Design a protein with these regions (language model features):
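Ligand-binding loop in jelly-roll beta-barrel domains
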Residues: 68-88
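Conserved short histidine dyad/triad with adjacent acidic residue
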Residues: 16-34, 67-69
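A generic "binding-loop/recognition-motif" signal
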Residues: 25, 35, 54, 70-71, ...
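Short acidic-glycine-tyrosine-enriched beta hairpin
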Residues: 52-69
Length: 88
């Protein structure tokens, strides 16, 4: 998915305009939650998300979503990760 398609998807799903988020190479965040739902488009690098014991990798062009208060862990690839994220 490209940025224009992602912006359109956000609008359809009732999300506000996204912000750019950058995470460091080989970084990680252990299990945590957010008090909001997230929809994000990976634009550079890679991120692995672990939810309910299942890990999935996301690379440029991939979209990931997290539900409100969904417990998850994050790990970032050797080039870190940059993504556009919107929350509601």
């Amino acid at each position: 998915m490209n940025k224009a398609q992602f912006i359109k998807l956000l609008e359809q799903e009732g999300y506000p305009q996204p912000i750019e988020v950058k995470q460091v190479p080989n970084g990680s965040l252990g299990d945590h939650t957010h008090p909001f739902a997230v929809m994000a488009l990976v634009t550079e690098g890679s991120i692995d998300l672990t939810i309910e014991g299942q890990t999935k990798a996301y690379e440029p062009g991939d979209v990931f979503q997290l539900r409100f208060e969904e417990l998850h862990a994050e790990s970032y690839g050797p080039d870190g990760v940059t993504y556009l994220a919107s929350r509601k």
